[in-house]
Every structure is written in structure tokens, then in C-alpha cells.
């Protein structure tokens, strides 16, 4: 007696279902998450206008706006194309690249916008810059924790290099502030790992549901074909 093997369809595979859910959540919230850095950059530029290097500030603001336009163009192309098994990895990598570049832009802000000069309150102005960056990272963690690599690609360049830079400056307050930023980065990493495990659990449950549905549909088809052969 011949056995019947029911292979899962590509759209029901575990890897595809996981990536598809991640992409859907990342891009569905991107309309708002892509806008926040622009608003934050404008507020920061207004506050730092009197103390920042003007040339650096102009270039940095230009990069923020250009990057936002590029991300919204990416979002528009995504909605025009959609997700399929053959392009899911591409859309995830594109989003990964966009958040990494955003993290670099904000990490640079904490190192070059405010001059380390005794004539200005460097710790105050740079502290506000890092406070805004930490706020953006913590807000993004809610969306980006579904994929640990996406969160790391954004948070690491945004927080770790400026934290190391503050420690490297050597004075008591800035070094302590840099250490607290690294501690904060550790805390959000632990929280993100827990959120990611919960997400993977729900994806596993959804995958099992889809596999059962797929096998049931295939069995119905096999049963229907078998009845047709009996009637012949």
C-alpha cells in the first residue's frame, strides 16, 4: 500500500512564517516610527543652535531628512510589492539597513554636534542629546524587539560608540554618564530578549495552526480524488 506524504507548502514553513510576521509588524508601524527621529532632530537642532558646530548641524539635519525620505520611499515600495517567500529576506535586509543607518546618524550626534569646550556646559547639552537618543531607542524597542538583529542594528551604533566616547573623555561626570548609558543598553537588551522569546512562542503557535489547516486541506483533496476514482 502506497503511503501519502503531505509536504508543507512554502508559505507554511517555519522560517517564512517567522520572517513574514516580523516584516509585517516592522513595516506596519514604520509610518510612525520613521517620523519620530525627524521631529526629535528638529527639536534637538533648535536647542543646540547656539552651541553646536553649525556646519556639522546642517549636515546632520540634512542626513536626517534625506534618510527619512529614503525610508518612506522604501515603505511605499513595500506596500506596492507585498511579502512572498522569494522576497521576504530582501525586505527584512532592507529594513535592517535602514535602522542601522539611522542608528549611526544618532550615534554621531552624541559625538560631534556639541564641542567639548569648557566655555559651554558640555555635559548638559550633550546629555540632552543622549537623552533624546535613548528615548528613541526605548520607543523603537517595542517594535524592533520582534527581531533581535534589527534592534541591535539600531541601538548599538546609536548608544555604544557615544557612551565609549564619553568614558574616553576622562572627566568624572561624562565618564559616569557613559557608564550609565552602557548599563541602560544592557537593560533594554535583556528586556528585548524576553519580548523576542514571547513573540517566537506565538509564531510557533500560529505555525502549528497553519500546518494543521494545510494538512486538513490536503487530506480533503486526497479524499475527494479517492472518491472520484471509486466512482469510475
Segments from the language model and where they lie:
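Short, charged cytosolic
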Residues: 1-14
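Hydrophobic alpha-helical transmembrane segments of multi-pass membrane proteins
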Residues: 13, 26-82, 163, 182, ...
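Cytosolic juxtamembrane amphipathic/interface segments immediately preceding
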Residues: 16-27, 85
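Juxtamembrane helix-capping/reentrant segments at transmembrane boundaries
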Residues: 83-99
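Hydrophobic transmembrane alpha-helices
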Residues: 96-190
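Short helix-terminus and kink motifs of transmembrane alpha helices
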Residues: 189-203
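Amphipathic alpha-helical coiled-coil "transmission" helices that mediate dimerization
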Residues: 197, 204-232
